[in-house]
């Protein structure tokens, strides 16, 4: 058996099935398209689900892929075992109603025995208990040893998920131990002990299970297979661990090199090395597919992996940021099969480095807080961290809850996950209450996505804003209907339309639909997952039926404003590339009739000079009134022409290229002006960061830009009137005001310090003795925290064996400070504990060290009661 590299195996598999008339498709993005049920692609067949369910027509009836996948369900085992990982590649060959078992089984056997040349005597096969058809094909169409075919039950060899398509499967195993297996019981035991390892699963989707549990035969059965590439590589390379596979081991060796540690010498170090090795693969591919670290969704998965890897780097003694360097190894080993990695190499590294920097900024303070929590747990003989405290680490310091759990587990402690989840849910509900969520006017997504494939709409809106058409389908309240009447809302599909459906960041058109018996408003236009154009209609008068002839008319003024904004995004994108560099790629956009929003990757905010330069470059190309041309061409031709493609978008073989003179050329399906001069004026209104490495520019054009400038001019006039000066003198007047304000504040601070100082004598004279310790307390008015600390420190410095507790009411807020001398601390005084109980009375919280602590509160009227509690607290804690 020849030792084959992981990249070799991938190519051999795809080439083999290409020769069997399969269309080789590139891996889909890790970000699921039109599937809200998934955060990340987790299986080879997942992106192909619309083809299996009939929602979309497949590009070929036979397809072969190598799909990037991420699973984090077993993340706690990653690093602890030699086979668990979060990132893997899944090889698969698929048939959509074309070939079936009699082809799939012999081809699988041919590939593993004749191409990979696996020894036949080390191969086992399982089939479903009652699948005689599969057994006969294995025996008659291959030379597998019949004694090595085992029949297993539904749990092992029948694929189903609730109701819907399902079927038996056949799995192929490799024998590692070379021990004779004579029965099903021995086979199952060998599999459980990893003596034999499953590497290829052939699923025969031949039934449709109904709600009554009946299995009805499909008229067009499908084939869905999956072979784990990394697992196959361990077999072909004679290894027992995925971390010994050539491309993965290269990463592991670099981790050892960076950390100065050796593998297989120390158990805990090995766990950290394996975690980093695995996680950097997921991190690199996720960022390549446009995912960025955040606190929710797939962005949170990325942040969790990245910060977990960074934390284990610190466990290995790596103090510097290193993950961004480590991504080089992943890219170098995978870029031949995934060229996007090479194209986005610098982008990937910068995103990783930025997140490492952010983690470095928070981990020290976060670890300090966590260690304090751990100390509190140890002092109170408790093993469970409160959910509220875990949430504080997550929300304030960016500690993924899983990282907190992992650190606590090392101390044999845990987290109150129920309490944490409750706090998390409260935060989500607060965010949700700030926005409203609506569906398509009562039309359920499931119905909209079940529109028959034969119903199609021709889009005529590039050349016309009016069309005469026929009604082909209607939906009301989640059901297909034949009539829509006055006052009702619904979705209408027609044979041809001038209405642009929301896509590529451009909002859908609005307008009217009518005939002699009916009038309706089209209030939105969208695509369903299969690209069907959906008109969302409110019926104003009359009624409309299936097959009625109707006229559709787009709101021209609104469309014109949208076109100005859309063409401006193209000018803006090119201007940003010329001013900031070629690394700039669009990562999102929004275009409506009022404004445009443009998201792009860049790693720092734009300064005023850069913004001015970008804005002027756009306006220069507007003034030059450049012709806007659109051309249809092949994707290959478009790339050769230098046309810019949108970050991580998928395109068909024929694409539409929009060119603005010689300045910009971009793939785009949106609507545009015929000449850049039609835009009139472009004005940037804001620039901000929205995620790690992602900036957002908002701008207005045409009439909206003029209105924006008028509003700025009116504001300047109003300010000038208030200052009783000309507009040119405003800055000078403001400088004078600020200088005067600065002096007044300085005088006020000095006065507050004097005020606090005048109270010093009365506080010293009011000393109390509690268990042999001098207790100085005082309440001051209109004194801030700084002045309060200065006074407390001054009193402490003049005393021995003393505790100082001061409170103030400043601007309706409570400030509290506690300080203790060294000899008082030695007797058991802990200012942090004192201040915590005192602050609670005043409706606040806080903490600190044994010798100094501070806190705030919400109830000034409780201040005297709070300060008065100090004596009782000291009675408890002083030895």
UniProtKB/Swiss-Prot annotation:
Keyword DNA-binding: no
Organism: Clostridium kluyveri (strain ATCC 8527 / DSM 555 / NBRC 12016 / NCIMB 10680 / K1)
EC number: 6.1.1.7
Enzyme class, spelled out: ligase
Catalytically driven reaction(s): tRNA(Ala) + L-alanine + ATP = L-alanyl-tRNA(Ala) + AMP + diphosphate
UniProt xrefs under Pfam families: DHHA1, tRNA-synt_2c, tRNA_SAD
Main location class: cytoplasm
GO biological process terms on file: alanyl-tRNA aminoacylation
InterPro entries: aa-tRNA-synth_II/BPL/LPL, Ala-tRNA-lgiase_IIc, Ala-tRNA-ligase_IIc_anticod-bd, Ala-tRNA-synth_IIc_core, Ala-tRNA-synth_IIc_N, Ala-tRNA_ligase, Ala_tRNA_ligase_euk/bac, DHHA1_dom
UniProt cofactor(s): Zn(2+)
Family: Belongs to the class-II aminoacyl-tRNA synthetase family.
Domain of life of the source: Bacteria
Function field: Catalyzes the attachment of alanine to tRNA(Ala) in a two-step reaction: alanine is first activated by ATP to form Ala-AMP and then transferred to the acceptor end of tRNA(Ala). Also edits incorrectly charged Ser-tRNA(Ala) and Gly-tRNA(Ala) via its editing domain.
Cofactor binding note from Swiss-Prot or TrEMBL: Binds 1 zinc ion per subunit.
Domains (record comment): Consists of three domains; the N-terminal catalytic domain, the editing domain and the C-terminal C-Ala domain. The editing domain removes incorrectly charged amino acids, while the C-Ala domain, along with tRNA(Ala), serves as a bridge to cooperatively bring together the editing and aminoacylation centers thus stimulating deacylation of misacylated tRNAs.
Location(s), subcellular: Cytoplasm
Any one GO cellular component localisation term in the record: cytosol
Keyword set, alphabetical order: Aminoacyl-tRNA synthetase, ATP-binding, Cytoplasm, Ligase, Metal-binding, Nucleotide-binding, Protein biosynthesis, RNA-binding, tRNA-binding, Zinc
Residues that hold Zn(2+) according to the record: 566, 570, 668, 672
Organism phylogeny: Bacteria, Bacillati, Bacillota, Clostridia, Eubacteriales
Name the record gives this protein: Alanine--tRNA ligase
The UniProt record lists the keyword Hydrolase: no
GO terms for MF: alanine-tRNA ligase activity; aminoacyl-tRNA deacylase activity; ATP binding; catalytic activity, acting on a protein; transferase activity; tRNA binding; zinc ion binding
């Amino acid at each position: 058996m020849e030792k084959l590299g992981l990249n070799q195996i991938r190519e051999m598999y795809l080439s083999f099935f290409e020769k069997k008339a399969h269309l080789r498709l590139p891996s889909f993005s890790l970000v699921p398209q039109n599937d809200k049920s998934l955060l990340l692609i987790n299986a080879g067949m997942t992106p192909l689900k619309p083809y299996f369910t009939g929602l979309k027509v497949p590009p070929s009836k036979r397809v072969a892929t190598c799909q990037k996948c991420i699973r984090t369900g077993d993340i706690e085992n990653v690093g602890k075992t030699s086979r668990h990982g979060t990132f893997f590649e899944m090889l698969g060959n698929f048939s959509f109603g074309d070939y079936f078992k009699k082809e799939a089984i012999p081809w699988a056997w041919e590939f593993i025995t004749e191409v990979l040349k696996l020894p036949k005597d080390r191969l086992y096969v399982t089939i479903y208990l009652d699948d005689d058809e599969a057994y006969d094909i294995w025996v008659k169409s291959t030379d597998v040893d019949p004694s090595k075919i085992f029949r297993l039950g539904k749990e092992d060899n029948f694929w189903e998920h609730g109701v819907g398509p399902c079927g038996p499967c056949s799995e192929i195993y490799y024998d590692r131990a070379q021990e004779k297996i004579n029965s099903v019981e021995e086979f199952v035991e060998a599999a459980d002990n990893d003596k034999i390892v499953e590497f290829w699963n052939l699923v025969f989707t031949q039934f449709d299970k109904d709600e009554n549990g009946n299995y009805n035969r499909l008229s067009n059965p499908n084939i869905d297979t999956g072979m784990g590439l990394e697992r196959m590589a361990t077999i072909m390379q004679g290894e027992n661990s995925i971390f010994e596979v050539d491309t993965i081991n290269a990463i592991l060796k670099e981790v050892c090199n960076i950390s100065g540690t050796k593998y297989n010498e120390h158990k805990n170090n090995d766990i950290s090395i394996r975690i980093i090795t695995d996680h950097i693969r997921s991190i690199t591919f996720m960022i390549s597919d446009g995912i960025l670290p955040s606190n929710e969704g797939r962005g949170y998965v990325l942040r969790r992996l990245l910060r977990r890897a960074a934390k284990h780097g610190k466990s290995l003694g790596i103090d510097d940021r290193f993950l961004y360097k480590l991504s080089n190894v992943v890219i170098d080993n995978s870029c031949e099969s995934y060229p996007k990695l090479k194209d986005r190499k610098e982008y990937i590294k910068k995103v990783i480095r930025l997140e490492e920097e952010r983690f470095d900024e928070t981990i020290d303070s976060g670890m300090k807080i966590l260690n304090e929590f751990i100390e509190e747990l140890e002092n109170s003989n408790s093993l469970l961290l409160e959910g509220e405290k875990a949430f504080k680490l997550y929300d304030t310091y960016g500690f993924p809850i899983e990282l907190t759990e992992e650190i606590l587990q090392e101390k044999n402690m845990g987290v109150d996950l129920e309490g944490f989840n409750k706090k998390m849910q409260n935060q989500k509900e607060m965010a949700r209450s700030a926005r409203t969520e609506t569906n398509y006017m009562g039309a359920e997504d499931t119905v909209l996505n079940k529109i028959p494939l034969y119903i199609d709409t021709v889009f005529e809106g590039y050349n016309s804003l009016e069309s005469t058409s026929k009604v082909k389908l209607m939906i009301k309240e989640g059901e297909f209907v034949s009539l829509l009447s006055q006052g009702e809302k619904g979705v209408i599909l027609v044979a041809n339309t001038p209405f642009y459906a929301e896509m590529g960041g451009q909002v859908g058109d609005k307008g009217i639909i009518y005939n002699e018996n009916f009038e309706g408003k089209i209030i939105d236009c969208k695509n369903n997952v299969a690209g069907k154009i959906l008109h969302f209609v409110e019926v104003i008068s009359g009624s409309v039926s299936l097959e009625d002839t109707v006229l559709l008319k787009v709101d021209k003024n609104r469309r014109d404003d949208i076109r100005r904004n859309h063409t401006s995004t193209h000018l803006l994108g090119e201007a940003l590339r010329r001013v900031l560099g070629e690394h700039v790629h669009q990562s999102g956009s929004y275009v409506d009739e009022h404004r445009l929003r443009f998201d792009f990757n860049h790693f720092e905010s734009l300064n005023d000079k850069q913004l001015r330069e970008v804005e002027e470059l756009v306006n220069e190309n507007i003034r030059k009134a450049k012709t806007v041309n659109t051309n249809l061409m092949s994707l290959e031709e478009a790339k050769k022409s230098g046309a810019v493609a949108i970050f991580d978008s998928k395109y068909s073989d024929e694409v539409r290229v929009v060119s603005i003179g010689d300045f910009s050329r971009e793939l785009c399906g949106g609507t545009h002006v015929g000449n850049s001069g039609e835009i009139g004026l472009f004005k940037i209104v804001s620039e901000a960061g929205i995620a790690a490495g992602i900036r957002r520019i908002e701008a207005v054009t045409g009439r909206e830009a003029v209105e924006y400038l008028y509003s700025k001019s009116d504001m300047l006039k109003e300010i000038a009137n208030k200052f009783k000066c000309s507009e040119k003198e405003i800055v000078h007047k403001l400088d004078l005001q600020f200088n005067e304000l600065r002096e007044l504040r300085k005088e006020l601070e000095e006065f507050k310090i004097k005020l606090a100082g005048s109270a010093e004598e009365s506080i010293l004279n009011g000393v109390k003795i509690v268990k042999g310790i001098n207790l100085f307390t005082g309440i001051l008015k209109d004194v801030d925290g700084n002045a309060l600390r200065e006074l407390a420190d001054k009193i402490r410095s003049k005393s021995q064996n003393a505790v100082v507790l001061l409170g103030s009411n400043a601007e309706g807020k409570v400030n509290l400070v506690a300080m203790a001398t060294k000899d008082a601390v030695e007797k058991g005084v802990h200012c942090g504990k004192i201040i915590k109980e005192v602050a609670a009375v005043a409706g606040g919280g806080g903490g600190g060290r044994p010798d100094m602590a501070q806190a705030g509160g919400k109830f000034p009227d409780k201040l005297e009661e709070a300060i008065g509690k100090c004596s009782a607290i000291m009675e408890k804690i002083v030895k």
